[in-house]
Design a protein with these regions (language model features):
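Conserved alpha/beta-hydrolase "acid-adjacent" motif
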Residues: 268-274
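Catalytic histidine-centered segment of alpha/beta-hydrolase-like enzymes
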Residues: 296-308
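Alpha/beta-hydrolase
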Residues: 167-260
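N-terminal cap/lid segment of alpha/beta-hydrolase-fold proteins
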Residues: 2-37
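Conserved acidic catalytic loop of the alpha/beta-hydrolase fold
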Residues: 108-129
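Short, surface-exposed "cap/lid" segments of acyl-processing enzymes
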Residues: 35-79
Length: 327
């Protein structure tokens, strides 16, 4: 069940808006820039497969978040919680046995949730277009939306996106239930599994323990389970696995917006071959960047190199890059 949404900072604004699923509302958190640019610029953050906006772009380590950095650069920042996450309504199927339904929150459904959020934001701010930052699986609904509604999208920052991998001979993707429980141990393992054994941790235990408590707070029933765990829709994970069986949930060639792919050197979910394929597949994008940041993994936004991610994303959203020189 969703929990009441405390403000992370005093000037944060909260909105519950209608979503594409009947009788289910979506939650948006909004932090306007104190010194807004002229004209105003809005960024929508689209989260990944296991935790919502409060635990990602809005989470502060040592008093500062990615959202704060974007605000300082003049961007109004919005965070969407998909159905089944954070403060958005849960799918009714999440109250039943996980085996009784197909994986919840697939990209087609999620893209319609992104559209509902984007149209609300544009109307609220009286803007014609916005930029999107997505993480991991979140690139799938973000790019589906961008392809279907090119006039509404300024720029796309795809942080740790999932790419299509070649089909596996004699192998089909496994089937998954509707949802699963994700424990703190599951999340900690994600932070350490891709770090080379001879390298120091990319996230301190102190920071993880602080983040972990907030993660459990995102599901009102998490601490009633043994072990503690957050109920999470499995559509995103199922689509990651399908992408690695040559079934990517969107067509990159249909995206017309400028695109930046930002990834960590140690990101096991998008390697150099994946990135090259995805970069080339964005064939209609007028501006493309492939940015690899050292000593970082798939969860770079919560790691020691997070500020490098912030800087690169802001630079791209600002249109930074080499000028085109006439031939």
């Amino acid at each position: 069940m969703p929990v009441a949404a405390p403000k992370l900072v005093p000037n944060e604004q909260h909105f519950h808006i209608p979503g594409p699923c009947e009788e289910l509302s979506l939650f948006l958190r909004f932090l306007p820039a104190e010194r807004a640019s002229t004209p105003r610029r809005a960024v929508l953050y689209v989260h990944g497969a296991t935790f919502p906006s409060a635990l990602s772009i809005a989470h502060r380590f040592d008093g500062r978040s990615w959202r704060d950095a974007l605000n300082d650069a003049g961007f109004d920042v919005w965070g969407l919680d998909f159905h089944g996450f954070g403060h958005s309504d849960r799918y009714p199927e999440m109250s039943a046995s996980a085996e009784k339904a197909a994986p919840l929150l697939v990209a087609d459904d999620a893209a319609r949730q992104v559209e509902a959020a984007a149209r609300f934001i544009l109307a609220h701010e009286d803007l014609h277009k916005l930029s999107i930052i997505s993480h991991s699986w979140g690139a799938m609904p973000a790019c589906r939306f961008a392809a279907a509604h090119p006039a509404l999208v300024d720029r796309l920052v795809l942080f740790g996106p999932i790419a299509r991998r070649p089909p596996r001979r004699y192998e089909t993707p496994p089937k998954f239930p509707a949802w699963r429980l994700v424990t703190l141990e599951d999340q900690w393992n994600r932070f350490v599994e891709d770090v080379p054994v001879h390298e120091p941790p990319v996230l301190s235990r102190r920071h993880f323990e602080e983040w972990g408590e907030r993660y459990l707070d995102s599901d009102a029933e998490s601490r009633s389970r043994d072990p503690f765990g957050v109920k999470t829709p499995l559509g995103p994970f199922s689509e990651i696995i399908k992408a690695w069986h040559s079934q990517l949930a969107y067509d990159p060639t249909a995206v017309c917006a400028p695109v930046a792919i930002i990834r960590g050197e140690w990101d096991g979910l998008i390697n150099d071959d994946d990135t090259r394929w995805l970069f080339d597949a964005f064939s209609q994008s007028p501006v493309k960047r492939d940015i690899k940041i050292s000593r970082a993994t798939h969860l770079m936004h919560l790691e020691a190199q997070r500020m490098a991610l912030w800087e690169e994303s802001i630079g791209f959203l600002n249109g930074a890059g080499p000028a085109l020189v006439p031939a």
